[in-house]
Amino acid sequence: MIKVALPKGRLFEETVDLLLKRGIIEKRIEEGRKLILEEGGITFFLVKPSDVPVYVESGVSDLGVCGYDVYLEKKPSVYRLMDLGIGFCRIAVAGKPESEEKYFSSTHISVATKYPNIAYEFFKKKGVKADIYYLNGSVELAPLVGLSDFILDLVQTGRTLKENGLIVIEEVGKSTAWLIANKDSFRIKNGQIMEFLSRLVQHNKDGLQVQGSS
């Protein structure tokens, strides 16, 4: 039996819909207080999205559904098998409209983010010195109260930014959900994992991208 880490929150429903559509599970599993579920001969762990790569890299889970944003931030030693084509959003720098000119002209700024590693690498490549504040909550507050000049965060609809008087200033990248695998599990449970993967690929009518084990 393979074990799969599923992200709680916004990605959960999309992931379950995909598993149902591909015939991997027959009954809908629900997000609730129970954190270990079994369906279709698979054990599912419901975990915080940022914890998915931890469970997979450690071998507690054989597979996991992980946002590409989390993958870039954590850089886990896992195999990235397949772009699932769900959970699309942008990684972007945002701020007050009046700060846009400062963003493009200054060589020293401050940025609040849940993604300090992504932010560091991005601004390093731009040749901009960035004082990075790691926050685990609503980063939109930071430029409003003077903690930082800008934020770097996920943007899905842009509604939260708009409601707080912020705008997207520069796009850093795009993120979708990926299927990742533990390296040892991929070798030891290769048959089961490839069967799981083939069921996704076999019904691949939505243009899902298969990357391979690298």
From Swiss-Prot:
SUPFAM superfamilies: Periplasmic binding protein-like II (SSF53850). GO terms for cellular component: cytoplasm. It catalyses: 1-(5-phospho-beta-D-ribosyl)-ATP + diphosphate = 5-phospho-alpha-D-ribose 1-diphosphate + ATP. It is found in: Cytoplasm. Keywords: Amino-acid biosynthesis, ATP-binding, Cytoplasm, Glycosyltransferase, Histidine biosynthesis, Nucleotide-binding, Transferase. Its main location: cytoplasm. GO terms for biological process: L-histidine biosynthetic process. Pathway: Amino-acid biosynthesis; L-histidine biosynthesis; L-histidine from 5-phospho-alpha-D-ribose 1-diphosphate: step 1/9. Its EC number is 2.4.2.17. GO terms for molecular function: ATP binding; ATP phosphoribosyltransferase activity. It holds the Pfam family HisG. Belongs to the ATP phosphoribosyltransferase family. Short subfamily. Lacks the C-terminal regulatory region which is replaced by HisZ. Heteromultimer composed of HisG and HisZ subunits. Catalyzes the condensation of ATP and 5-phosphoribose 1-diphosphate to form N'-(5'-phosphoribosyl)-ATP (PR-ATP). Has a crucial role in the pathway because the rate of histidine biosynthesis seems to be controlled primarily by regulation of HisG enzymatic activity. HAMAP family: HisG_Short. This is ATP phosphoribosyltransferase.
